[in-house]
Amino acid sequence: MEARIIGLKGCGKTTLVSALAEGRGEGHIATVHVGDPRVRVLSEIFQPKKTTFAEFKVQEVAWPEASARKGEMERYLDALAGGQLYLHVLRAFASAQLGEPAHPEADLDELDREFLLSDLIRIERAFERAKKAPLPDAGKKALARCQEALEAETPLREVDFDDAQLSFVRGYQFLTLTPQLLVANTESEGSDQGDRWEVAALAKPARGRHAVAFPFPDALEVARLSVEEQEEFAAALGLPGPAAEVVAQAAFAQLGLISFLTTGSDEVRAWPVRAGETARDAAGAIHSDIQRGFIRAEVVSYDDFMSHGGNMKACRDAGVLRIEGKDYLVADGDIINFRFNV
């Protein structure tokens, strides 16, 4: 998965990249490791040669300078194409440098409108091109439906497309079609800037988007600590947790992702998949050969595994280690061993 970090100037995008990178970032790009405590526990039990957490990449896309904005805005919007998720950063802290109080709700509305306008322009261009290279009727109807929604100020991610329409529309890389997670950069706890802004203020303008809030500078300080120290210091600073963990969990929720787990002496690993995927689909996340030659899946939930002493034999004897077929719907935290033949 790849995410783009977006937001107006001065909101803290670069600081967020650093906090998410935990020292592993390269400029405005970072790889976020999803700190799943279940993976850590299983790694302690199995003592594998390798432990692999789920991860995703983030890239900051800088907001155009006001002096060059007219010429740069289109390039900025084009740079957002290809992201599977936008981390939309909002400034919710006072800034003497910017010389104005924070207005996160208004900032959210400003960028939302830019995205709506950009998508409308793309649709108009698509219809212009269609005069020379006609679109299929289904394509015309899909674009007309998009145009109708956008003119009503409805982002395309809120439109209930069928599978065929969605496949067609995705080809245009409309910005309002991409899911968003709102990430608010707030005042530190104990700040003398008056009442702290609360993320609940976004409930209405978020329009179904998940939102998290924490002070990015504090999160960056926590990210520089060892994994063992991060939880303790995050709590001491009033943070909901380390930034990478908080953002990753919210991003998974926004995208409808879950993780299943594989274990063994070679590797303990978390595998992200869409909620509702079958065992056979999940096997394909590991390797297409496993999906193609799928026979069965041996499944035990993480909770059942731990309640039976972290012992597979005990799980088998108790009947909580199950044999599932290809149509089994994978649940978050399932520990799965795939049997296959190719």
List the predicted regions and their residue ranges:
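C-terminal-of-GTPase-core extension/linker across diverse P-loop GTPases
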Residues: 1-17, 21-22, 129-332, 336-342
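Conserved G1/Walker A P-loop phosphate-binding module
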Residues: 1-96, 112, 123
